A protein has these predicted regions:
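Short amphipathic alpha-helical coiled-coil/interface segments
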Residues: 163-171
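Short, glycine/acidic-rich hinge or "gate" loops at secondary-structure transitions
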Residues: 176-192
Length: 485
């Protein structure tokens, strides 16, 4: 977790008075509104470092013999555990939803003033708007937390703690994934930031940078400039990059000012907390892995609009930890007419949430430069209740339009991504939540829901109600195929 000061402003971190915990655990950071900076102090030592376990045990003791422990008693402790486990959520604002369907407008261009009498076209004064609906998604976590029995057994307390910790961990990962990569081509997923930016790219207003090289400060500056051109220079923002990438960026700084408090040793492996006064969040879920399956292809002269050419295909898995390196590409497919299609098959990846399908047109496939994104598809099939019924293992390209700026991440060059996310409430990436099954506003974004009540137990479920909203795609930027060396 990095510094949370954003351009010297009292961010939502201060507004919500949340304390940010450093993953290194030996330093505790908190935002000080009066000083407009982040203060660091040694973390208080506790006998048991599992704070959730301590709190659950305390709640059990408080319940007393002969009394029941209600799930609602643990809700504040679970919320603290969620934000401690999932730092990204502390930066993303949650807006109160008022209905199950939300309407919004996405701006693709911005009206600009022009002088009267100029001969140039005034088309820059017009704006294009796309109206869409965001259906609020309901996610049920893991899927049930065990019944809250009478507080008499230590073994029950240990089992309860383990289940609660696992449920919090799972919901945290799911929310991180949903904010960045989720794609609503799958009925049971929300729309993540990657989908917003890639849809924007098809409209030729893209903030996707295909770097294809070692990270430089110029790249970060270009991302900042692209966002600032959209007039978001004063907004709260956040860098997302891997730990190794953050360390590499730190070595590119030619001058660093370090304030050492009395008794604080100098740290040899110095990592910059911010770049351009924007905090850097070290996130391992933007570090790709080699989990994507190989793809086989079969060409047909009918069923599509593919023209006469040679074609190659590859797919990459998107799982709960983000986009992975692309798998082994298909052999060369040949289409001789103008109505061709290509059917793809692969062995399903049980951990996949989505597949990203890439296509190359040409006689040979040399590098990932040749592959371009043509489609994002669901990785699973479901029944009417949302239960997984199978894995998706096929796709047919009938002539989809490729996004020229989006190439797959290649393991041979150890590609990675860097995100610049606008977190300003109602303008940047925002979570919409707080609607129950009946469409009524509720006080929390996620909560423990009582399923049934029996003589000695209160079965509960962790549920979250949210959708993602990004009104202005150009308020964010992503750099793809960035390397440490």
């Amino acid at each position: 977790m990095s510094n949370v000061t954003v351009r010297g402003r009292d961010t939502f971190v201060a507004r919500n008075a949340r304390k940010l915990a450093d993953p290194r655990r030996h330093i505790q950071r908190a935002y000080d509104p009066s000083a407009r900076t982040v203060v660091e102090r040694p973390r208080e030592k506790v006998a048991d470092r599992n704070e959730l376990a301590l709190r659950v045990k305390a709640a059990l003791d408080t319940a007393g013999t002969g009394s029941y422990l209600l799930g609602y008693d643990l809700y504040p402790e679970l919320v603290d555990a969620l934000y401690d486990r999932t730092p990204l959520l502390q930066f993303i604002e949650t807006a109160q939803a008022t209905s199950k369907v939300h309407e919004y407008r996405t701006r693709l261009t911005y009206p600009r003033p022009v002088f009267q009498g100029e001969g140039a076209s005034a088309s820059s004064t017009s704006g294009t708007y796309g109206t869409g609906n965001v259906t609020l998604k309901i996610a049920r976590g893991y899927p049930e937390v065990t019944g809250f029995l009478e507080a008499t057994s230590k073994s029950f307390a240990d089992a309860l703690i383990e289940e609660l910790a696992g449920a919090v961990h799972g919901i945290g990962e799911f929310m991180e994934y949903s904010l960045l990569w989720a794609n609503d081509v799958d009925t049971y997923q929300v729309k993540g930031l990657a989908e917003w930016l890639e849809a924007d790219a098809t409209a030729k207003v893209s903030n996707i940078f295909d770097h294809d090289g070692t990270v430089t400060l110029t790249l970060l500056d270009n991302m900042l400039n692209a966002v600032k051109l959209a007039s978001w220079s004063g907004d709260a923002m956040l860098w997302l990059m891997s730990t190794s990438m953050a360390q590499k960026v730190s070595t590119l700084q030619t001058r660093a000012n370090i304030q050492l408090s009395p008794g604080q040793p100098f740290e040899g492996a110095m990592v910059m907390n911010t770049y351009g006064n924007i905090p850097i969040l070290e996130a391992d879920y933007v570090t790709p892995r080699t989990t994507s399956p190989a793809v086989s292809a079969s060409a047909s002269e009918s069923g599509g609009t593919l023209g006469a050419a040679y074609y190659y295909y590859a797919i990459s898995t998107v799982d709960i930890e983000g986009e992975q390196f692309h798998g082994t590409a298909s052999s060369r497919m040949t289409i001789s007419g103008s109505t061709g299609s290509v059917a793809l098959t692969w062995t399903g990846d049980a951990s996949a949430q989505l597949y990203r399908v890439y296509r190359s047109v040409g006689d040979t496939l040399n590098t990932a430069d040749d592959l371009k994104l043509i489609k994002v598809i669901a990785a699973k099939t479901y029944d009417g209740s949302g239960n997984v019924t199978g894995l998706v293992e096929s796709f047919t390209d009938t002539g989809y339009t490729a996004i020229s700026t989006v190439h797959p991440l290649a393991s041979a060059s150890n590609d990675s991504t860097i995100w610049l996310v606008n977190t300003e409430a109602d303008r940047g990436l925002t979570m919409l939540g707080n609607i129950d099954d009946d469409g009524r506003p509720i006080a929390e974004m996620w909560r423990l829901v009582e399923l049934a009540r029996t003589k000695d137990s209160f079965p509960m479920m962790l549920k979250i109600y949210f959708a993602n909203l990004a009104k202005y795609p150009t308020a964010h930027a992503i750099a793809r195929r960035v390397r440490v060396s």
